[in-house]
Regions:
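Short juxta-domain linker segments that transition from a proline/glycine-rich
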Residues: 1-327
Length: 327
């Protein structure tokens, strides 16, 4: 095919040339479902292209490095007709099966990556974006806005996990809640509610609630403190404690009148350790140059070095690491 013919084909199908020249853009386009509010569609599509590059690079590096992909794909036996109680119970059961402990939110991201083969990426997202679920035939990915409060991040991660586990039976829309008609809107609303109940059960199972003990004299401060222990928001924990009969319903009324300051929590490192490890190996093996890796991650070379340090990953020798890493 000649260059003019190629350009004609690209123009006809409205496909950018980079789709064929950039090795990190997957030929099998990832499916995304975004959890967002008030984002400009064009900006969101541009950000999605960046996310597709990160995902594509992670996959291609894995193939070139001979790293096995998970042959198992986890699913959740729920449908949009399932009850909220069933969704909550499924979340709680998964917390036990994955051995997330008494603070599931603190362990969820690591367990999703280590035991479920799901890539988690903490990203600097556009304003209004909380997170996204993305799936390919051989990889599931959860993207989370790392600049959200910890409780929101963990809830979004659990919510996106639900979508990844139910993608075949309840495929989410590109935008959460996007519907073509009233009937579809009702169904999608139900699915989102099921996702929220699953997330609540996963992050706040009965065992974790019981481990909190009895409320202190200042219920508002006690709930706020225990929410920090679990890695959830005080409001979300308040609902669960009321359902469990541990605190009175008046708590929600009182807390809405008396706004509590958000707890300051540390910003999680960019991307994730598995992503950083694979990127470092790719640089060491000559699969990508340091400068190209900086462009891929949208970081300066110095910031990329700090990325490896933040995740406890040894820097490649070309970035000041030991020479032995290239062996």
């Amino acid at each position: 095919i000649t260059v003019p013919e190629l350009m004609t084909v690209l123009e006809f199908f409205d496909v950018p040339l980079e789709r064929f020249t950039n090795p990190f853009i997957p030929m099998a386009t990832p499916k995304f479902s975004w959890r967002q509010s008030d984002s400009e569609i064009d900006d969101l599509r541009q950000f999605e292209e960046r996310a597709s590059e990160w995902i594509g690079a992670y996959r291609e590096f894995g193939r070139a490095l001979g790293e096995d992909r998970s042959a198992l794909r986890h699913t959740l036996d729920l449908t949009f007709k399932s009850s909220f109680e069933e969704a909550t119970a499924a979340g709680s059961a998964m917390a036990r099966q994955l051995e997330l402990g008494i603070a599931p939110g603190k362990a969820l991201a690591d367990v999703m990556q280590q035991r479920m083969g799901i890539l988690v990426l903490m990203v600097d997202a556009l304003p209004g974006i909380s997170g996204a679920a993305s799936t390919l035939p051989d990889l599931d990915v959860a993207l989370i806005n790392r600049r959200e409060p910890e409780g929101r991040r963990n809830f979004d991660l659990a919510h996106e996990l639900f979508h990844l586990l139910t993608w075949k039976t309840m495929p989410p829309k590109w935008l959460d809640g996007e519907a073509a008609n009233d009937a579809e809107a009702k169904k999608l609303k139900r699915i989102e509610q099921l996702a929220d109940r699953f997330a609540a059960g996963l992050l706040m199972p009965k065992e974790a609630i019981e481990a909190l003990g009895e409320p202190g004299e200042d219920v508002n401060e006690w709930v706020k403190e225990k929410a920090g222990v679990l890695g959830v928001s005080a409001q979300a924990l308040g609902y669960e404690l009321i359902d469990a009969g541990i605190i009175c319903p008046e708590y929600l009324h009182n807390s809405s009148r008396r706004k509590l300051a958000r707890r300051a929590t540390a910003l999680p490192p960019l991307f994730s350790r598995p992503f950083a490890e694979r990127l470092a190996k790719a640089i060491s093996r000559g699969l990508i140059s340091v400068s190209r890796a900086a462009v891929l991650t949208d970081l300066t070379i110095e910031a990329m070095g700090r990325l490896f340090d933040d995740h406890g990953v040894v820097r490649p020798s070309t970035m000041g690491g030991p020479m032995a890493d290239a062996a």
